[in-house]
């Protein structure tokens, strides 16, 4: 398991710019070669350089797992084609629901999903149909309803908001079928998604993440 620090466009909030699963990593266009190389070495994935809704904020707009990449309704045709042309062995679906910040409202791996609780029943049904998993429910983490912003879950492990209770951790572990721990990133931020990206091969954290935080992250994601 590789753990490395990264800065993107001069910020430690690296998670807002990148989506990854175990096969593909979507990054902004115009990212420098050195950064792309570090991402590729860490995640061991194929890199897709694009925008989403003409924005570099890939991690905010995209959600998904090893079976499907979910794109917001405001994505344009060229962006969809770019992703579909490369990510040929996963489904790529446009999610026609009101919110577009899918990375903030959907927390998922290949086994389960936790969804923003204020979605309508129709929107919930659309997400469930797109993910094609039964283990899906609405909820919050540490009283925060934008569940995607406070957690990162892979098919091996997960890290969530530091204030998550033991009872919540137990429920989350059962939902996602992986071990889950609590922690922080970037010198005390509990919004894990903003400063951490992970798949089964490695973890990248914002460069402000401290030694003790990295030790905790390492423990959470190690085999």
Swiss-Prot record:
Annotated keywords: Initiation factor, Protein biosynthesis
InterPro entries xrefs: eIF6
Pfam families cross-referenced by the UniProt entry: eIF-6
GO molecular function ontology, one term from the record: ribosome binding
Source species, domain of life: Archaea
Gene3D superfamilies cross-referenced by the UniProt entry: L-arginine/glycine Amidinotransferase, Chain A (3.75.10.10)
An example Gene Ontology biological process: cytosolic ribosome assembly
HAMAP family on file: eIF_6
Similarity section: Belongs to the eIF-6 family.
Function: Binds to the 50S ribosomal subunit and prevents its association with the 30S ribosomal subunit to form the 70S initiation complex.
NCBIfam families referenced in this protein's UniProt entry, alphabetically: eIF-6 (TIGR00323), PRK04046.1-1 (NF003126)
Protein name: Translation initiation factor 6
Organism, scientific name: Sulfurisphaera tokodaii (strain DSM 16993 / JCM 10545 / NBRC 100140 / 7) (Sulfolobus tokodaii)
């Amino acid at each position: 398991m590789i753990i490395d620090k990264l800065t993107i466009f001069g910020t430690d909030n690296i998670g807002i710019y990148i989506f990854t699963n175990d096969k593909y990593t979507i990054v902004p266009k115009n990212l420098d070669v050195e950064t792309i190389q570090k991402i590729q070495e860490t995640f061991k994935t194929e890199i897709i350089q694009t925008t989403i809704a003409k924005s570099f904020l890939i991690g905010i707009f995209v959600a998904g797992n090893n079976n499907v990449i979910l794109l917001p309704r405001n994505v344009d045709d060229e962006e969809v084609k770019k992703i579909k042309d490369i990510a040929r062995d996963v489904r790529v679906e446009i999610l026609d629901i009101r919110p577009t910040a899918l990375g903030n409202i959907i927390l998922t791996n290949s086994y389960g999903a936790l969804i923003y609780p204020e979605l309508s029943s129709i929107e919930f049904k659309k997400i469930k149909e797109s993910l094609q998993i039964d283990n899906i429910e609405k909820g919050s983490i540490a009283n925060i309803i934008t569940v995607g912003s406070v957690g990162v879950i892979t098919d091996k492990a997960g890290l969530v908001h530091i204030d998550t209770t033991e009872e919540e951790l137990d429920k989350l572990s059962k939902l996602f079928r992986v071990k889950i721990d609590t922690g922080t990133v970037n010198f005390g931020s509990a919004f894990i998604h903003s400063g951490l990206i992970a798949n089964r091969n490695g973890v990248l954290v914002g460069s402000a993440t401290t030694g003790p935080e990295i030790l905790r992250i390492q423990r959470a994601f190690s085999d």
